[in-house]
Amino acid sequence: TRVSAPLFVRPETGLNDNLNGVERPVSFGIKEQNDKEVEIVQSLAKWKRYALKRYGFAVGEGLYTDMSAIRRDEETDNIHSIYVDQWDWEKIIDKSDRNEATLKEVVRKVYEALKNTEKYMASRYDYIGSILPEDITFISSQELEDRYPDLTPKEREYKAAKEYGAIFIMQIGGALKSGQRHDGRAPDYDDWSLNGDIIVYYPVLDIALELSSMGIRVDEDSLLSQLQISNCMDRLQLPFQKAIMDKELPYTIGGGIGQSRICMFYLRKAHIGEDQSSIWPPEVVQEAERNGILLL
């Protein structure tokens, strides 16, 4: 079921995505409400789970929405913008389905849709060929570290994506054997043992390109554990996190599919600004113009 997405939320609800815990949300006061502060969303990861409960969805049912977010502290480049647009989705599952088999089943469905869309684009435009492999390869972040211990996480992603064409890197957020994390994840939405990213090899830029991030969401046990690890126990006082601990919210799986990312991929563009209107440093705009690239 498609639903309307909020552009801003109240910070005291705990519904905004804190990302890695250091990115500052954009906030402003509402004049009519005595300048009560609200925050522009950074993602809808938590809000979607809350909405499923509030709207009365049942096990096996879900929602999707058209999300727009602003990430003011994003380090921009060819594939990163301060403006984030995603197809966001969330589905209620039974607690017994909080397992890797459920995650992989959903990943395969999302990948099948991505692959079929590429085939359609290739049939319509001569310059676009199908480059996605028939099947996606599953690999854990620890397996990547074991295989490439001397490389950075991003370098490992590139190696694996180039080898397999399309990969789903599982278990992102927790510490690996080296003590380092593969990548940061907020401790209060994804279960770090049951999440991951769909990443494809993108020959236009010779990079590993993340198209989607998803995961089975925390239950009361994994939330407590991850908040302890992240030294964020104060969040247990917020309504959203408290509702999880009190088992008032449904168990869910959810994720986001980057709209501009997949447009960039399907159209074989060199910069995300070619299919998304945002603001870029002047030197980036000038360099793009020198290379015949129009940033919207």
Task: List each model region and its residues.
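Class II aminoacyl-tRNA synthetase-like tRNA-binding/catalytic domains
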Residues: 1-80, 88-92
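Surface-exposed helix-capping loop/turn segments at secondary-structure junctions
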Residues: 1-3, 118-124, 265
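N-terminal pre-domains immediately preceding structured catalytic cores
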Residues: 9-16, 130-139, 281
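A general structural signal for short secondary-structure junctions and capping/turn motifs
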Residues: 18, 29-31, 53-59, 79-81, ...
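Short connector loops at helix/strand junctions that flank enzyme active sites
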Residues: 35, 61, 84, 164, ...
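Alpha-helix initiation and N-capping motif
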Residues: 45-49, 63, 86, 100, ...
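Extended, charged alpha-beta segments that form solvent-exposed binding/catalytic grooves
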Residues: 65-151, 155
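A translation/RNA-centric and nucleic-acid-associated enzymatic feature enriched
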Residues: 68-70, 141-296
